[in-house]
């Protein structure tokens, strides 16, 4: 077995199949498992997906939200066990794969049309 096939076989077992399909422009609720000392809790991070990158086990996505007037972006590995679950709140209609232009927009200008 070649190295490439071996790596593919190992990573295939690590991929998660319980995640919903989502695209840039969608609004997600990401339930993240946070461990503080001996305690474990779930924190919900809700925002708009501004990018997805990579493939296979190394795929990541970035979610952006506005928290008390400050833009917060958080990048998550897609197949990490730290993500409890992902809920798609809204499906957004955008014509770009990377929504970096949302960083400069404020208020109503930063809205994304919803797919009906």
Swiss-Prot record:
Keyword set includes Ribonucleoprotein: yes
GO molecular function: structural constituent of ribosome
GO cellular component, one term: cytosolic large ribosomal subunit
Pfam families in the cross-refs: Ribosomal_L19 (PF01245)
BP term (GO), one: translation
Cross-referenced InterPro entries: Ribosomal_bL19, Ribosomal_bL19_CS, Ribosomal_bL19_sf, Translation_prot_SH3-like_sf
Transmembrane segment boundaries: none
Claim: Cell inner membrane is one of the keywords in the record: no
Keywords, alphabetical: Ribonucleoprotein, Ribosomal protein
Xref: HAMAP family: Ribosomal_bL19
Primary role: This protein is located at the 30S-50S ribosomal subunit interface and may play a role in the structure and function of the aminoacyl-tRNA binding site.
Assigned protein family: Belongs to the bacterial ribosomal protein bL19 family.
The name this protein goes by in its record: Large ribosomal subunit protein bL19
């Amino acid at each position: 077995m070649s190295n490439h096939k071996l790596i593919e076989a190992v990573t295939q077992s690590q991929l998660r199949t319980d995640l919903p399909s989502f695209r840039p422009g969608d609004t997600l609720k990401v339930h993240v498992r946070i461990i503080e000392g001996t305690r474990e809790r779930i924190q919900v991070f809700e925002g708009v997906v501004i990018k997805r990158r990579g493939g296979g086990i190394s795929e990541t996505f970035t979610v952006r939200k506005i928290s008390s007037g400050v833009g917060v972006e958080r990048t998550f590995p897609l197949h990490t066990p730290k993500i409890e679950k992902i809920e798609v709140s809204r499906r957004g209609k955008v014509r770009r794969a990377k929504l970096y232009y949302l960083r400069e927009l404020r208020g109503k200008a930063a809205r994304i049309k919803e797919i009906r």
